Amino acid sequence: RQRQMCIRDRHIAGHPEGSKEIDPDGTTANVDQALSWKNEFSKRTDASMAITTQFCFDSNSVIEWANGIQKSGIDIPVHIGIAGPAKLQTLLRYSIECGVGASIKILQKRAKDITKLLLPYKPTQIISELAAYKSSNPDFNIEKVHFFPLGGIKQVSQFVKEI
């Protein structure tokens, strides 16, 4: 007897800061078109979907992107990607490898402050800013946080316990 497999939940990629690999010209045309197609797919099927984004460090970019996709009719819930606690060098390396644009500038600014170079990065600021925005805008489409354990699972787990 053959068993039928069923995928109930689908998570798709979101790119609040674009993707140079998908849109080498620096626009978000291909990323936007793909997200629109996936949104239409979710409407015409029984697909339960969520958008899980690349990791981000800048709440303004996230808020602008999330509001923009919502205004364009994309109603798939968003799980925002956040880099967990890690050394600055680790975050810069992953940011460059993954092409998280605007966020690299935030990390570079932090790298110039010698006192912050010695301390591990913690995503407290972006989490606080997004939580405050969600609190005053309940229809904001970010529903969950997805932590990328770039500094290790133990560090992320400890951070989550602290917040």
Name the predicted role of every residue range.
Residues 1-7:
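Short, small-residue-biased leader/transition segments that mark boundaries at the very start
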Residues 4, 55-70, 152-156:
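Active-site-adjacent beta->alpha loops and helix N-cap segments on the catalytic face
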Residues 11-32, 112-124:
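Active-site mouth loops of central-metabolism enzymes
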Residues 13-19, 54-58, 81-87, 147-152:
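Active-site beta-loop-alpha junctions enriched in small/polar residues
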Residues 23-45, 61:
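Active-site glycine-rich loop that binds ribose-phosphate moieties when present
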Residues 38, 47, 80, 145:
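Conserved, mostly hydrophobic/aromatic
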Residues 44-46, 70-75, 137-140:
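Short helix-capping segments at alpha-helix termini
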Residues 76-140:
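Catalytic-face loop-and-helix region of soluble metabolic enzyme cores
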